[in-house]
Regions:
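Entry beta-strands of beta-propeller and related beta-repeat scaffolds
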Residues: 9-11, 52-55, 94-98, 150-152, ...
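Loop-centered beta-sheet repeat module
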Residues: 129-176
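Beta-strand-rich domains and repeat architectures in extracellular enzymes and scaffolds
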Residues: 1-17
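Repeated scaffold domains used in trafficking and secretory/extracellular systems
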Residues: 1-2, 40-47, 82-89, 186-191, ...
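Short, solvent-exposed loop/turn segments at conserved positions within beta-propeller repeat blades
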Residues: 59-60, 102-106, 156-158, 209-214
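Extracytoplasmic beta-rich repeat domains
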Residues: 40, 123-143, 176-191, 230-241
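Asp-box/BNR beta-propeller loop motif
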Residues: 16-38, 61, 65-80, 109-128, ...
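Loop/turn-rich, solvent-exposed surfaces of beta-rich toroidal or solenoidal domains
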Residues: 205, 211, 231-263
Length: 265
């Protein structure tokens, strides 16, 4: 359900506690299953530093693991009936952040400042307040984007917005309401990417109507303050992941969806 590029390999994790590594040199795949105290977790979020690979489970309990030569180490655990983490990212070798569904209408935010050795959850009173029925989608681990020290998170459901932080997730601001389909649990922004600190894209739509193009994407050229809808005849319908191709001057992107793999230049 998620993958990340390492120095020489691709690491991935998914359903039924499965994780593994793809050797990009000889094209071999090694898989394993992780059981912790009898818990069989599903993983939808992975991330890596230059030293370690991390994977984060969905559901209760939320389990965050760090891969080491000696095996997997549990570095964070959270238990709550409503706990559900959607995305995990590192902006450098020290700072990492995980974003999860709201608990009592407040977004779940967990961060590390020491390369993933210890993780701390942002106080409930400091976390962004979401509307009833508003949440974050576990969409290909891409509901959060970063550039430098800037973070953007997209929401969906009853409301689709962009939340922004420029201080490692300690304080957040409601940056913009998105011109995407919203109002239903299956609608909203699913994925966001930034080429630099000004140019970005969001894709989403309605995963129960994957061919509906209206309200499925938008572009920004001012850091996420304002968003221009992608014209219906140019849109691809529902998408769960979009990324800029490096060194393309912001012109080349790839996106994935149930309708296929798409490229734009």
């Amino acid at each position: 359900r998620a993958m990340v590029l390492l120095e020489k390999n691709v690491a991935f994790a998914g359903s039924d506690a499965t994780f593994g590594f793809i050797n990009t040199q000889n094209q071999t795949i090694a898989t394993s299953n992780l059981k912790n105290r009898g818990v069989i977790s599903d993983f939808r979020a992975v991330a890596a530093t230059s030293q370690n690979f991390f994977m984060l489970s969905i559901g209760n309990p939320a389990l965050l693991y760090k891969a080491e030569q000696s095996g997997m180490e549990e570095v964070y655990r959270e238990e709550h009936p409503d706990v559900f983490y959607d995305v995990l990212r590192f902006t450098d070798d020290q700072f990492g952040i995980a974003i999860g569904d709201p608990i009592d209408n407040r977004l779940s935010v967990v961060t590390t400042l020491n390369g993933g050795q210890q993780w701390t959850k942002l106080m409930w009173s400091q976390s962004p307040k979401l509307e009833e029925g508003e949440s974050v989608f576990a969409a290909s681990n891409s509901a959060l984007a970063h550039y430098g020290n800037k973070l953007w998170v997209v929401t969906g459901g009853s409301k689709s917005r962009v939340l922004f932080s420029d201080n490692k997730g300690y304080k957040w601001q409601d940056l913009a309401t998105l011109p995407l389909a919203q109002g239903q649990a299956t609608q909203g922004a699913f994925t966001i990417a930034f080429y630099n600190d000004q140019q970005g894209i969001v894709l989403g739509g309605d995963y129960e109507q994957p061919t509906e193009r209206k309200g499925s994407g938008a572009l920004t050229f001012d850091g996420g303050k304002t968003w221009q809808p992608i014209a219906t005849d140019k849109a691809i319908g529902y998408a769960s992941c979009v990324q800029y191709i490096p060194n393309s001057e912001g012109n080349a992107l790839v996106a994935t969806s149930p309708n296929g793999l798409f490229f734009s230049n």
